[in-house]
Amino acid sequence: MKKVLLISFVILSVAAQMTHAQKQAVIKLTEKTLMHEMRATPYPLDKAVVNDRAVSFQWPLRSDMNSQDSPLDGFEHKVKKVDKTKVTYRLRYSQDAGLKSGVVQVETRWPFYNPEQPLTPGVWYWQFGYVEDGQVTWGSTQQVTVEDRPGKFCPPSLKTVLAKLPADHPRVWIMKNEWKDFINHSKQKAERQWYLERADQVLQTPMKSVKDINVSQVKNLKNEMQINSYLTRESRRIIDAEEGNTEALIRAWLLTQDTKYADEAIKRVFIMADWDKDKNVKGDFNASSLLSLCSMAYDSFYDRLNTSQKKALLEAIKNKGGEMYENFNNRMENHIADNHVWQMTLRILTMASFSVYGDLPEANTWVDYCYNVWLARFPGLNKDGGWHNGDSYFTVNTRTLVEVPYYYSKLTGYDFFSDPWYQGNIMYTIFQQPPFSKSAGNGSSHQNVGRPNSIRIGYLDALARLTGNTYAADFVRRTL
């Protein structure tokens, strides 16, 4: 009888504990959304502890600028206009809770700030403020505890980066002082021949033009949304193909210094430079593709261009880059995930900015923005390494995820791949789709991904080489 009572008591106790645990596990959602589309809270949050990276201060936009609307392709002109040249913020921080002594105060044109030197370990207090008509409206005081630990990610300031930027050209896809060694070293690589074969095919291929854009269905469409969507798709067919062809010629020139590739690429770039002025060319991808070609031509062929050609390219870069920066400025940095930006357009503006820095005054601002917004927000918009935007589109981002930190690492000597996000992202990339497996299912079109594609494998191969991660290397070995 005692044994029965004891067993009954144990069962009741366990049941009670399970019920209590289940009650504790219930999370009630009270917000309208799981996350804010535009930043609604300062970062770091009050009482936060930061120990994995240098602190980046970030805060919400002014209420009159805090639009959640990211312009659709072809509808950029519909976005509410604010004179962003007059937008400024103040930030102050100190280890004094009253912000009376040892205060660092800065003014910034964007709602984020990366201190030039990492904050020393300890408790810090900070405030942001909106500046309007010379008056500052301060937010509440936030507290953040900074801890130190081995391997903490503390990239250099922009001042350090620019001090190491070469004055000559090329300096983006290849550094001029390394060019000859690069050519000689590339002769041992199989990939070199792939690029040259593609470029040789391009030399034999007549260019298409904007007149080849298929507009046959426009007459059957009912509204501006349908027309712009259709023209965006059809114009991309032409521009994507011609961008790929011309980029192949530029790469072949950098691999060989053979003038036949340079001359043909220069001719094609100047034909395409004004294509974005055509009424049938729509969308930010098309605009960024043309900016990429103009800036890569300027940097790669600098010593072959005459004065008027350089001037024309700088003017094109100024106009295209200016429009792109205007779209980013005081919007993108607070948007949770503007996919086109992460996939392509920020990378292109970054490379364009560094290609003309020192030659185009506007590039001073672009370089500042691109570099510091990368430190503040990138590479993954989170800390765990997962690509929460959706796995099917993950591989569209791989050029940005590799090329931008690689370029910064090359310039500075600091390893941008030491960002702890990359080690987490390697695990995500592997476990989201193991060798010879379908995607685990996250985001649109994941059901169409039947096995790891070449881009996913190539991305892990690049990270294995750049970080020494043996899991990534093993994944590549097993899937090839």
Model-predicted regions and their roles:
Residues M1-K23:
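Bacterial Sec-dependent N-terminal signal peptides
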Residues K23-H77, T145-E147:
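Pro/Thr/Ser/Gly-rich low-complexity, intrinsically disordered linker/stalk tracts
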Residues D69-P121:
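Recognizes extended acidic, P/S/T-rich segments that occur
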Residues V131-R149:
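Extracellular fibronectin type III
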Residues V144-I174:
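Low-complexity, Pro/Ser/Thr- and charge-rich linker/hinge segments at domain boundaries
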Residues Y195, I227-K438, S445-H446:
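Aromatic-lined, polymer-binding surfaces characteristic
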Residues N442-L480:
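N-terminal leader/propeptide and maturation segments of large enzyme subunits in energy/redox metabolism
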